[in-house]
Amino acid sequence: MIKKIAVVTGASSGFGMLTALELAKNGYEVIATMRDQKRNTTLLSEANSSGIADNITIHELDVTSAESVSLFKELVGRVGQVDVLVNNAGFAGAGFVEEIPIDEYRSQFETNVFGAIAVTQAVLPIMRKKSKGKIINVSSISGRVGFPGLSPYVSSKYALEGWSESLRLEVKSFGIDVILVEPGSFQTNIWTRGKKVTENSLKKESPYYEMMRKLEDHIESGSSKFENPKNVARLITAIALKNKPTMRYAIGRGVKMTLLFKMLVPWTIFEKIVLSKLR
């Protein structure tokens, strides 16, 4: 049986961990990467209990470090094959534009955008030589719809979307597919431990303090309705197994309706609805 190799970044938790497990269950040999290998406990425990531990190897990878990416490139070079790359590593920067230091924007883009680019550049030569491969980029509905207080995250996902479109057109003729997965709200730590709010917007003297508080309340009040992240992992795995995947896969309660609504109604109406969520 011909082995299939998948690489998943940000695999210590959330979509990344669940996707690594799901791919392994479906016959892939998974290279699960994470910035801190000490956070591999849950992944290893789940893999052992599911009887798929032999299908998963864990490697340290900081997508923002040139040295770390170089070591990763050497690793996949030795393996000589990558059938699927899942660019999942990321976090959510929050706060209001006037108050966010430019370095925090840079940090957001270093992980969510430049990190994905660096890892993709490491595997593309292998995929191109094999004339096959799938690059699945985990975006978000935030890559299609803006929201106040989340401009670092939103802008990084918009950038990922545009880059993915260009990349798909560049590598299609080499037998490589580039796919975007756009989740809505799911039960991961992206809005808890994975969220980094600029300190200035948390100060009571901030002119945006009330809006920041309402944003936090909005996220917290909706958390009970967040969906099972395993659904996203299953979708990513289905895409990996699909012969001719399309460009975008939106997933989550109300996501497709929101995208359609934004496309059809005048912006003035759409913005009133968005702003009403923070009243």
Regions of interest found by a model, annotated:
Residues 96-97, 104-106:
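Substrate-binding pocket helix/loop in short-chain dehydrogenase/reductase
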Residues 58, 100, 108-109:
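A hydrophobic alpha-helix adjacent to the NAD(P)-binding/active-site core of NAD(P)-dependent oxidoreductases
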Residues 120, 156:
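Active-site helix of classical SDR
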Residues 50-67:
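Rossmann-fold cofactor-recognition segment
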Residues 12-14:
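Conserved glycine-rich cofactor-binding loop
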Residues 172-223:
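C-terminal beta-strand-loop-alpha-helix "lid" module of Rossmann-like NAD(P)-dependent dehydrogenases
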Residues 140:
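Residue(s) in the substrate-gating loop at a strand-loop-helix junction
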